[in-house]
Amino acid sequence: QSTNDLIKACGRELVRLWVEICGSVRWGQSALRMTLSEKCCQVGCIRKDIARLC
């Protein structure tokens, strides 16, 4: 997936892309809930979360 696809992704779609990129990602339910509730679409936040979750 390209970075542009990640920038456009929000909520569940962003989580789906994370799973595709990272493979089997082990994350807590709290992290997943935070991602879905914040619906973070900002490049910096996405990069930070990918680094943290992957």
Swiss-Prot record:
It holds the Pfam family Ins_beta. Relaxin is an ovarian hormone that acts with estrogen to produce dilatation of the birth canal in many mammals. CDD domains: IlGF_relaxin_like. The keyword Disulfide bond applies. Heterodimer of a B chain and an A chain linked by two disulfide bonds. Disulfide bonds join C10-C41, C22-C54, C40-C45. The keyword Secreted applies. It is found in: Secreted. It comes from the Eukaryota. It comes from Balaenoptera acutorostrata (Common minke whale). This is Relaxin. Transmembrane segments: none annotated. The modification Pyrrolidone carboxylic acid is found at Q1.
